[in-house]
Structures are given as C-alpha cells and as structure tokens.
Amino acid sequence: MSQLHRGMHKKPGMFPPKEVLEEVDAGSGSDTETEETVECTEEEEEQDETDGLGDLGMPPPKKTTKSAASPTVPAPALIPSLSHLIGLEGKQPSRKYAPAEWPQYFKQKISVARDNDTFNVLYTPPDDSEAPVYVFHHGAGSCAESFALLSVRLREMMHEERFQLAATAKIRDENKLPGMIAFDARGHGFTEVESTDYSLEAFTNDFAFIVANVVAEFGLTNNLILVGHSLGGAVVTNACHLKLIQHPVIGLAVLDVVEGTAIESLASMQQILNSRPKSFPTVEKGIEWTVQSHTIRNRESACVSVPPTLISQHDGPGMTWRTDLMLTKPYWKGWFTGLSEKFISCAPAKLLILAGTDRLDKDLMVGQMQGKYQLIVFQESGHFVQEDAPDKTALSLIDFWKRNDKVNKTVPLFGAFRA
C-alpha cells in the first residue's frame, strides 16, 4: 500500500472576483493575455515547428525554399544565440522572468510512495462531488507545473460561470469547482524513480498507480477527465485503452500529438535537442531563453513551468536540464506507435486539441469525419497549447465536460470551439 504525505503548503483563496470573461469565438486568434504571451513575427512563426524543444511529438521542421548558402539570405538559426540571451557583459535579467512556485496554482503538494520510488504530485481538491477532476500528464522534458496556469483558469472560469448562473437564479449553488491532479513523471521534476525504464508501458503503469492512490487517499467519487500533452497524450490514451483506471472516466483529452507526425519528427529530434543551450547561468535566464525561443510563448506560464525542469550543475555554477532526453531515445518510437487507433477506440468521449490542422494523420482524419471524437484547432498556438493558450484550453475543457457529464444539468455559457 502506498503512502501519501500531504504538503505543508496550502493556498486558501485562489479565486477573487474577476471581470466577466468575454465569450471566445471559434475563429478567434490567441488568448487575450497580451502581456503574458510573447508575440512573434511571421518569420519567427515559420520556425514554430522547431520550437517545441522541451517535448517530443512535434512535426519535422518546415523546409525553406531559400538556399542556406545564399550570401544575402543567411540560413535561419534553429535556436537563438545563447550568448545573445545571456549578454556578454553579464547584465542581470529582467525581473519579468522571475520564477514562480506551485502554491500560486495548486492547493497541496503530496508525495506518493511505491517501494523505493517517490512521485511528486500537485493537487487541488474539487469543491463538490459532482464536479469533475482533471488528471494531467505532461510531455517529455516537462513537469507537473506545465498545467499550473491552466488549472487556475479552469477553476476561475468555472467559478465565474456559476456565479453568473446563481445571480440569475438558474442554480442554487456555485460550489462545483473542479479538482486537479498533476504529477512529475519518472525522470522528470521532483519525482524519484530508481528504474531507467522510459517505455510507454512504464509511464502508463505509473499513471494508473498515481490515479488509484490519490483517488483512494482523498476518497474521491468524482468523474475523471484524463488530459495528456504530447508524450502525456500517448500515456493517458494507453491507460484508457487498456482500462487501467478503475474509476469512472468520462473524458479523454489529448493535446497536440498525432501518431503520424510524431513518428516523422523523431528523425530531427536529436538535432533539435543538441541545438538547445546545455546550461544557463541562472534559472531566470533559462526562463528567458524558453520564452524568447518561443518554446513556450506565455511568459507567466514559463515562469512556473521552466524552473522544475532545471537543476544545479554538479561540475560548476549555473543550471542545466534536469531530464536528459537523449536517455529516452530508444523508447521514442514506441511511445507513439498505434496512438491514433487506440485513441479512436477508447470508450469515453474524446477531445483532440491541435496547434495547426496539418497534423492529422489518415486514421484521425477518418475518425474525425465519422464523428468519433471532437477536434479543436488553435491556429496561433505553439506546441505547448495548455501554456500558450490557457484560456482557450480551459474553455474547451469546460465545454467538453458539460457535453459529456450526465450529472451536469447546466447549459454552457461559453461558445463551443469548432474545428
């Protein structure tokens, strides 16, 4: 039997009154977080496909019609110069890249023990037994905090909606805010696992273990919605396909990963990983590089999701990547093989959110035409859709829950996104 240890930190009030959120139209562009999201030029957008450096499951870099050897048009750099970002004079970084911490986004931090392994879990309990619990799995090279901003947006928007309904006497209460479960996968963040097995099977068994133990520890009876980004999408899909979650699952949401393009991108992944800076003088410089390289476009999200992916160097000053993704290379193809077929065959309602329409493979195109899952496309988002566009992602997940939860009796206020 595993042991769960509750964190010492709790955050009591996360949802002060906010302005009424404007309805987001299906064809709208990026979120309205203009101060948090770094804008990019058309030239930079052409390189977006090579910017998802912290995760796998990306399409191959787009080809340019201009010669790299042209004396007048130099080849575009895959990564911004590290010396440019750090500054040759050693000037201090702007405080706008100051690291943020998990208590601003989750209410509890707990440890789930299994033999000699310890999993780091971030948890926010649901406010009502009828509210859903979203269970998140991050992608390769990322961490639980990749869903931090999304978690807050989900509860804020749900609170705002129920406040409006209560004000018009359409409901009797406003306490059905969703719960959140996010954790660091093996080899990532602050989770400590002895094994170096990074197969899909190992990740999937870990996921099922975490869900079972958190549900049991807190006595949750709520319906679950599984949400996975990139590699995490393959993990939650596999767990659902194998029926490893012994608790009601009403929804499966996969964020920006498609089997066909994921496997195609593997040929360029080593080049992309080798092109990343190997170290940073400070955590703030790591955040700055992540934002300026458009790996994550939302500065607020990067400030909380990047720090756990860095660790102090053993052989000198500065920070380096916590997860050595090259150690996972033997498992890359196995992560995504069969993903589309498994996703389409899963019993719960299914949602696929993509950053671009060109990423559907044949199986998914056929399944989408047959109405086997809901497809939403964020045209102006990068690979980390939950971080780049947390408002749109939250609205989509709320609408997805309301469409598929038999317990829910309210009509969504938010307009649905359409493919």
From Swiss-Prot:
SUPFAM superfamilies: alpha/beta-Hydrolases (SSF53474)
Reaction equations catalysed: [phosphatase 2A protein]-C-terminal L-leucine methyl ester + H2O = [phosphatase 2A protein]-C-terminal L-leucine + methanol + H(+)
Region listing for Disordered, in residue ranges: 1-75
Protein EC: 3.1.1.89
InterPro entries: AB_hydrolase_1 (IPR000073), AB_hydrolase_fold (IPR029058), PPase_methylesterase_euk (IPR016812)
Comp. bias (Basic residues): 1-12
Gene Ontology MF terms in the entry: protein C-terminal methylesterase activity
Keyword Translocase annotated: no
Keyword set, alphabetical order: Hydrolase, Serine esterase
Feature: compositional bias, Acidic residues: 32-52
GO cellular component: mitochondrial small ribosomal subunit
Active site annotation, chain numbering: S230, D256, H383
Biological role stated in the UniProt entry: Demethylates proteins that have been reversibly carboxymethylated. Demethylates the phosphatase PP2A catalytic subunit.
Sequence similarity: Belongs to the AB hydrolase superfamily.
Protein name in UniProt: Protein phosphatase methylesterase 1
Species of the source: Yarrowia lipolytica (strain CLIB 122 / E 150) (Yeast)
Species lineage: Eukaryota, Fungi, Dikarya, Ascomycota, Saccharomycotina
Gene field: PPE1
